[in-house]
């Protein structure tokens, strides 16, 4: 009789160890949508990715809008001349109502003489 209870105790302890190694099943009453068995819910993951990417998209859109505004400004200010993207981005930051001459460091010179001798 004592042997039987000892075997039952060993079997019970083995079941307990085995149950510890198995993943716990999700409680049906739990409302944690973030993870099941340590795996993130795909809808929650998509939200995380969207939140991480959103500032990048907004920054890219702002930069693109700034370049377009600068190109428009260059075209009006310099009689239809076009600007490269970097110049357009710089011009977009100027005050559009200020028609005074801007400091030379804001202009991009492509003239070899100016670049060689460094007048500015």
Curated annotation (Swiss-Prot):
| Iron-sulfur is among the record's keywords | no
Q: List residue numbers at the site (Cleavage).
A: 77-78, 93-94, 108-109
**Which keywords, in A-to-Z order, does the entry hold?**
Autocatalytic cleavage, Host cytoplasm, Hydrolase, Protease, Viral capsid assembly, Viral release from host cell
Could you tell me where the Polar residues compositional bias lies? 1-23
UniProt modification remark: The proteolytic cleavage of the internal scaffolding protein B releases the scaffold protein in order to continue virion assembly.
List the record's Gene Ontology CC terms alphabetically. Answer: host cell cytoplasm; viral scaffold
Q: In UniProt terms, what function does this protein have?
A: Participates in the assembly of the viral procapsid in the cytoplasm. Forms first a 12S pre-assembly complex with protein H, and F and G pentamers, then twelve 12S complexes are joined by the D protein to form the procapsid. Internal scaffold protein B is released from the procapsid upon genome packaging. Autoproteolytic activity cleaves protein B and probably facilitates its removal through the pores of the procapsid.
Protein name per Swiss-Prot or TrEMBL: Internal scaffolding protein B
Give a single Pfam family match.
Phage_B
Chain positions covered by the region annotation Disordered: 1-64
Query: Where does this protein have compositionally biased stretches of type Basic and acidic residues?
Result: 24-36, 48-64
The record's subunit annotation is: Component of the procapsid complex composed of 60 copies of the internally located B, 240 copies of the external scaffolding protein D, 60 copies of each of the viral structural proteins F and G proteins, and 12 copies of H.
Enzyme Commission (EC) number: 3.4.-.-
Offer one example of a GO biological process linked to this entry: proteolysis
Which family does the UniProt entry place this protein in? Belongs to the microviridae B protein family.
The protein's enzyme class: hydrolase
Subcellular location per UniProt equals: Host cytoplasm
Gene symbol of the encoding locus: B
Native organism taxonomy: Viruses, Monodnaviria, Sangervirae, Phixviricota, Malgrandaviricetes
Main subcellular location of this protein, as a coarse class: host cell
GO molecular function annotations of the record: peptidase activity
Residues forming coiled coils? none
């Amino acid at each position: 009789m004592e042997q039987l209870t000892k075997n039952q105790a060993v079997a019970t302890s083995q079941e307990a160890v085995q149950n510890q190694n198995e993943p716990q099943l999700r409680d049906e009453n739990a409302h944690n949508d973030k993870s099941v068995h340590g795996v993130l819910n795909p809808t929650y993951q998509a939200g995380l990715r969207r939140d991480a990417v959103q500032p990048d998209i907004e920054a890219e859109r702002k930069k693109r809008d700034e370049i377009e505004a600068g190109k428009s400004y260059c075209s009006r200010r310099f009689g239809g001349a076009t600007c490269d993207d970097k110049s357009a981005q710089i011009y977009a930051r100027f005050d559009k109502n200020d028609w005074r001459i801007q400091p030379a460091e804001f202009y991009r010179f492509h003239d070899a003489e100016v670049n060689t001798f460094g007048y500015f």
